[in-house]
Amino acid sequence: VIQNAKREIYMEIWSQDFKFFEKELLNAYNRNVEIRIVGYDNFNSRFGLVFEHAFGRDIELSLGGRMIIIAADDSEGIVGKISSLKNDISDTNIIWTKNKGIVFIIKEFIVHDMYLIDVEENLVEQMKYIYGKGFKRLKDKVLGSNATYMIH
């Protein structure tokens, strides 16, 4: 997917998984492919535009793994979960697709996270006032107050 990209790559990835993609992403960046990343868990990159997701640990605990999400040139995508259990990959599931409709949804998911991260970073006090600490009121509204699924 990364090697095939000509214009843009959008991705969401945890810092410990980034090392497996960094060389190819740097090659793409050096080919003038725009790289936009939502990074989790103290993420750091020397290239591309990075949005740091603040709830990486919570999401990983809730899912039992780390998401990997990539959209390239509106034509190819990857989405899945990498298991947190070091010796058990049975819960690791990743799909690759060239279905443009699915790639569109993958990219929209990433872009949506980027918008929210930027808003959260710039309106910290307002968000806390409106939604409470950790966005509790928003999570309760969207997911229900008894939800066990706490992805954000």
Q: What is each of the regions a protein language model found here?
A:
Residues 15, 20-152:
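PLD/PLD-like phosphodiesterase catalytic module centered on the HKD motif
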Residues 1-11:
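Interdomain hinge/linker segments and adjacent boundary elements that couple functional modules
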